[in-house]
Amino acid sequence: MHTHARKIVQGFVHGQLSLIHAARRELWCAAVGAVMGGHWLSLSRLARALMGQGTQKAALKRVDRLMGNPRIGQEARVACAALLRTLCRGGQPLVIAVDWSEVAPGGVFVELRASAMRSGMGRGLTIYQQVYPESKLGNARAQRALLKTLHRWMPAGVQVIIITDAGFRRPWFTQVERLGWSWIGRIRAGVCVSREGTHWEQA
């Protein structure tokens, strides 16, 4: 199972991310393979998984250089854009779930994440994630940045459905509609809704 999955990852990385330096592509594949094999996403655990015939010190340096590379953030966005384009093939509607969540217990940081899925997929694949201070939870500017990025990456003609949990407000849904996309949103108890031209009613 892991061998087959690694081949899929390698095929995607080498086929879609050819502009990324070859050495980093190889290390990307090795690191992703290590995580898929059950190793924790930490510098020391990844280094142990990548030791091979070398020393742990050398493996630590490799992983540290990858994590500390100033280009890795931009290259991660390139990878997410390529993944999104891959998911858009076949003409099926693309469902994108957007939500805010805590990065870790304690609530110091929060993450705005978008996960894409289509018919036949077991679970969504993360295509966008950005970390903010907890004070930015629900921030409208951060949410606009997400939509702007996804729209820039999205191939023309794709039917998109955005799904959100409670907490997203009317301006968000208006922005989604302006992009020509559909949306589904969960609302909290006590919220009133209205079809255009009708009276407000409690949902």
What are these regions, as identified by a protein language model?
Residues 1:
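Extended, highly charged
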Residues 4-8, 12-92, 148-149:
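Electropositive nucleic-acid engagement tracts
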Residues 46, 95-102, 124, 160-169, ...:
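Short, conserved catalytic/metal-binding motifs centered on acidic residues
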Residues 56-58, 62, 91-154:
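RNase H-like nuclease fold core
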Residues 71-74, 104-108, 171:
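Short active-site-adjacent helix-start/loop capping segments
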Residues 80-86, 113-115, 172:
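Intrinsically disordered, low-complexity boundary segments flanking structured domains
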Residues 129-203:
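An internal, acidic/charged active-site-proximal segment
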